[in-house]
Every structure is written in C-alpha cells, then in structure tokens.
Swiss-Prot record:
Binds 1 Fe cation per subunit. It catalyses: S-(5-deoxy-D-ribos-5-yl)-L-homocysteine = (S)-4,5-dihydroxypentane-2,3-dione + L-homocysteine. Disulfide bonds: none annotated. It comes from Macrococcus caseolyticus (strain JCSC5402) (Macrococcoides caseolyticum). Homodimer. The keyword Iron applies. Its EC number is 4.4.1.21. This is S-ribosylhomocysteine lyase. Fe cation binds at residues 57, 61, 124. Keywords: Autoinducer synthesis, Iron, Lyase, Metal-binding, Quorum sensing. Involved in the synthesis of autoinducer 2 (AI-2) which is secreted by bacteria and is used to communicate both the cell density and the metabolic potential of the environment. The regulation of gene expression in response to changes in cell density is called quorum sensing. Catalyzes the transformation of S-ribosylhomocysteine (RHC) to homocysteine (HC) and 4,5-dihydroxy-2,3-pentadione (DPD).
Length: 161
C-alpha cells in the first residue's frame, strides 16, 4: 500500500487489525453543516473468517430494523462485500461510546428476535437466503467480545503515521 486510494478501507492495513472492533472510518460534512460519521463494525477477522451469507443477510435485516429503535440518527447500515462486517452511518452524532451502547442494544434485539423482518419476496430481493439462527450466533459472538470493541489493532501493530 504505497499509493493512497479513494476508498478509506482500501487504505486500512487489514493484516494488523484485531476483530471484532468498532472503528470510526470517516467523517463527511455537508454544505449546510450536517456531519455524517461512518463506523466500521467489524465482526470477523479479515482474510481469516467471514459471515456466511444467509446469516449475514438476516443480521442485516435485523440490525437495520432494530437499530432505529435506539436512535433516530441512522442514515444507513450496510454489509461489507467481504462479509466481515458492516458500515453504520449516523448524522449529527459523534459520541463513540453511545455508538457502542446502540450496537449492544441492537445485537441484544437480534438475540430476542423470533423472526427476520421483511423476509419475504415482496420486501426482500433474495428472501430465500436467510438464517435467523446464524444471525443470532454472530450477534452472540460479537456481544461476548464487547469489551474489546474499542481495540482496533493487534498488540504492537498500530499503523505508522
């Protein structure tokens, strides 16, 4: 990685991060003063493990629906194509500790769910690809490691400035 790229995550050295973690990935300010904070919610260690698509898909539905019960600041929650995490974008909300609390509440909602919201052909583009049990397992694993969500890099491997 010598040339700086346009995509923030392409400039992140994925070999030194230590998932799971919650990382501020970017800040954008609009012309009217609104500020978007984008967070990298990394569930799985890059290039070592990933979420299976049916479980990831259900987790996406569950988190997208339930996170909005805990804050009205969510702009979007999107899965990463590499299947290791999600991006969560919030408008005019910059409190990292509150983001962690919102994520914890949302993942607890996943554990309490008895169905995947919008899991049908009318509301979902691939309704056959879901796993509530898989989503719950991912949420449980993430919650079990919540004390380390603030640790982004492997010990002694922080990026050089």
């Amino acid at each position: 990685m010598t040339k700086k790229m346009n995509v923030e995550s392409f400039n992140l050295d994925h070999t030194i991060v230590d998932a799971p973690f919650v990382r501020l990935a970017g800040i954008k300010e609009g012309i009217n003063g609104d500020v978007i904070h984008k967070y990298d919610i990394r569930f799985k260690q890059p290039n070592k493990e990933h979420m299976e698509m049916p479980a990831l898909h259900s987790l996406e539905h569950l988190m997208a629906e339930n996170i909005r019960n805990h804050t009205d600041k969510v702009v979007d929650i999107s899965p990463m194509g590499c299947q290791t995490g999600f991006y969560v974008s919030l408008i005019n909300h910059d409190n990292y500790e509150d983001v962690l609390a919102i994520l914890e509440k949302t993942l607890n909602d996943v554990l309490a769910a008895d169905e995947v919201p919008a899991c049908n052909e009318v509301q979902c583009g691939w309704a056959a690809s879901h796993s509530l049990e898989g989503a719950k397992a991912i949420a449980q694993e993430m919650l079990s490691k919540k004390d380390s969500w603030h640790v982004i890099y492997q010990p002694g491997k922080e990026p050089q400035a």
